[in-house]
Amino acid sequence: MERAIFAGGCFWCMVQPFEEQAGILSVRSGYTGGHLPNPSYEQVCAKTTGHTEAVEIIFDPKQIAYKDLVELYWAQTDPTDAFGQFEDRGDNYRPVIYYTTERQKEIAEQSKASLQASGRFDQPIVTTIEPAEPFYLAEDYHQGFYKKNPKRYAQSSAIRHQFLEENWS
């Protein structure tokens, strides 16, 4: 099994697209990239810990390749927005691909270069590619949020879904 970590704005919106893929064993919401051990949601939202909201994905590379996960990641984000994602603003919502191996780093960098060269976006691709840091699980009420709170999830992801349809369909 391998591990992938992606930050793409609100972690609520990043779980479902990955959970629906064959070869995914788990997708958990959490926090990474900051300086405070085991932060709370309130601390991360206060923008004082340096963490991003992210998802940790455990996957079987025999069933789904890391490259495919990176491609799916791009299609869930606005890779031209370094200051958050959609209605969620701030460093804690910035887009980051966290790599756990040098091979993941190479794949992510190649994919980013290909996306930039594709001309899909007029602006530069600003998603950063950074080494994975400790990943802290978010509180239980954040796990599987789209299943537990479908109406609130739909409301909170409406702007994201509109952008994705316009730019990735």
Swiss-Prot record:
<feature type="active site">
    <location>
        <position position="10"/>
    </location>
</feature>
<dbReference type="GO" id="GO:0033744">
    <property type="term" value="F:L-methionine:thioredoxin-disulfide S-oxidoreductase activity"/>
</dbReference>
<dbReference type="GO" id="GO:0036211">
    <property type="term" value="P:protein modification process"/>
</dbReference>
<keyword id="KW-0560">Oxidoreductase</keyword>
<comment type="function">
    <text>Has an important function as a repair enzyme for proteins that have been inactivated by oxidation. Catalyzes the reversible oxidation-reduction of methionine sulfoxide in proteins to methionine.</text>
</comment>
<dbReference type="InterPro" id="IPR036509">
    <property type="entry name" value="Met_Sox_Rdtase_MsrA_sf"/>
</dbReference>
<dbReference type="InterPro" id="IPR002569">
    <property type="entry name" value="Met_Sox_Rdtase_MsrA_dom"/>
</dbReference>
<dbReference type="GO" id="GO:0008113">
    <property type="term" value="F:peptide-methionine (S)-S-oxide reductase activity"/>
</dbReference>
<protein>
    <recommendedName>
        <fullName>Peptide methionine sulfoxide reductase MsrA</fullName>
        <ecNumber>1.8.4.11</ecNumber>
    </recommendedName>
</protein>
<dbReference type="Pfam" id="PF01625">
    <property type="entry name" value="PMSR"/>
</dbReference>
<comment type="similarity">
    <text>Belongs to the MsrA Met sulfoxide reductase family.</text>
</comment>
